[in-house]
Amino acid sequence: MPAWNDYKDEAKNRGALAMELFVVTTKPCGDMELVKKTLPDHLKYQEQLEAGDALVMAGPVSDASGEQMNAEGMIIYRAKNLAAARVLADADPMHAVGARRYEIRKWLVNEGKFKFSIALSTKEVDLA
């Protein structure tokens, strides 16, 4: 497989969007009471990131069966680079207090379609 930046250049050269975002998968460390206690601060932090355009999307994911909530989540950041995205993830109260651990990866968005902008926490819609 090619190096990441080489692949990104190849994608751009073939006309793909090649927009680099950062995907964080987050899992509880075991203390569910700490997760519940930290949730309000975590949600406030997410709203701040959304207002500052660093948060693209975030929310919980189910278990593999699709039937159970397992307190895992996915966060997509817009950041200058992996180090900047890691700063955002480290500052999340869930990670800062040790309620959750995370993995972060670069994501190259090449395809998809959006027709409008929605700020989920404030329920604002922009039909630009």
Task: Give, region by region, the residue ranges found by the protein language model.
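Conserved, structured core segments of small domains
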Residues: 1-128
